[in-house]
Amino acid sequence: MSTNPKPAFRRILLKLSGEALMGEEGFGIDPKVLDRMAQEIKELVELGIQVGVVIGGGNLFRGEGLAQAGMNRVVGDHMGMLATVMNGLAMRDALHRAYVNARLMSAIPLKGVCDDYNWAEAISLLKSGRVVIFAAGTGNPFCTTDSAACLRGIEIEAEVVLKGTKVDGVYSDDPVKNPEAVKYDEMGYGEVLEKELKVMDLAAFTLARDHDMPILVFNMNKPGALRRVIMGDHEGTLIRSSRKTAE
């Protein structure tokens, strides 16, 4: 039960990994997981939260892996972008089935499949209460979907980038391998870099830091965690500028 009557955030960018959609499966999309995530997003919409979503594509394709096997990295990344579009289509469909208005925008044109990304239109849709799913990353190779999440978050003026992962925050070490690893509740950008903690890739993280975009890492597989994050309850790890953490 939340101790805060009002949501802590009004406009968010939710970053989900493609792997999160797999559930217990080794590949693809688990329909049960997809529907549960759609229901959790629906709860936010009902609270009046404006929700942007970026989904990775690792459950369907990883360009980096095939690049190591000899495939051209640009080609591999283009295939990875298309994988995020497939995940976006699945999420849009799940949201529609949950009676949530959602729009899918792609950074690469896919006429007849989804809309082209348009910054002004995205903000207008968010203000009207629609969920906006941003697909195809940034539209450029060599850029991760974490970079896309931070970029879109900054563009739509989100108050925070929520990074849904398999662990419930940022730890001093891998909690799976080291049971004595310590979980951080709040950190500054500099502290994360100093400790070399792997929150997201460096390009994405420094983009967020340079534009003072807070990042909140939490466990998306934990039922109710997303709502608790939104309500400002102690959930996950919040990373923001050190001057704010000191206040």
Curated annotation (Swiss-Prot):
Coiled coil: none annotated. UMP binds at residues 57, 77, 138-145. GO terms for molecular function: ATP binding; UMP kinase activity. GO terms for biological process: 'de novo' CTP biosynthetic process; UDP biosynthetic process. ATP binds at residues 15-18, 58, 62, 165, 171, 174. It catalyses: UMP + ATP = UDP + ADP. Gene3D superfamilies: Acetylglutamate kinase-like. InterPro entries: AceGlu_kinase-like_sf, Asp/Glu/Uridylate_kinase, Uridylate_kinase, Uridylate_kinase_bac. Residues 23-28 are annotated as: Involved in allosteric activation by GTP. Its EC number is 2.7.4.22. Its main location: cytoplasm. CDD domains: AAK_UMPK-PyrH-Ec. Keywords: Allosteric enzyme, ATP-binding, Cytoplasm, Kinase, Nucleotide-binding, Pyrimidine biosynthesis, Transferase. The keyword Signal does not apply. Homohexamer. HAMAP family: PyrH_B (MF_01220_B). NCBIfam families: pyrH_bact. Catalyzes the reversible phosphorylation of UMP to UDP. Belongs to the UMP kinase family. This is Uridylate kinase. It comes from Shewanella loihica (strain ATCC BAA-1088 / PV-4).
